[in-house]
Regions:
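Rhodanese-like catalytic fold shared by cysteine-dependent sulfurtransferases
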Residues: 1-34, 39-85, 92-129
Length: 129
């Protein structure tokens, strides 16, 4: 049966841990290896800005940049360690949820979704750039 975008987001959020901005901030402070990925297209970043420590890898590019079986020139070196803590965050959370699920399906074992995305991060008083 075909799924809608909202159904896929709900399924992703049911399968991948969702964390609050406060918990995400704390995790980033406690473990500097934590990688924050913003899966929006670069043109969409100015809407809310980006978490300063975040790496912008669009959802489309993430599908191959996280695949360690592809040639090295296609991959993102920051994604070699499948146990590295990763937080996915888009503007409001939906694309972050799909990206978190994608990474989990690709074998990443320590992935979380930022609840409410970058907008919730900003609303909680944390900086963006």
């Amino acid at each position: 049966m075909a799924k809608t975008f909202n159904q896929m987001v709900a399924a992703a959020m049911a399968e991948v841990p969702v964390i609050s901005p406060a918990k995400a901030h704390r995790r980033m402070q406690e473990d500097p290896r934590t990688l924050v990925i913003d899966p929006r297209d670069a043109a969409d970043i100015p809407a809310t800005g980006i978490i300063p420590e975040a790496m912008n890898i669009s959802y489309g590019a993430l599908t191959y940049k996280a695949d360690n079986e592809l040639p090295p020139e296609w991959r993102e070196p920051e994604l070699e360690d499948r146990s590295r803590p990763i937080i996915t965050a888009c503007e409001s959370g939906e694309l972050g949820a799909l990206s978190g699920k994608l990474l989990k399906d690709m074998g990443f074992s320590n992935v979380s979704i930022l609840e409410g995305g970058t907008q919730a991060w900003k609303d909680a008083g944390y900086p963006t750039k």
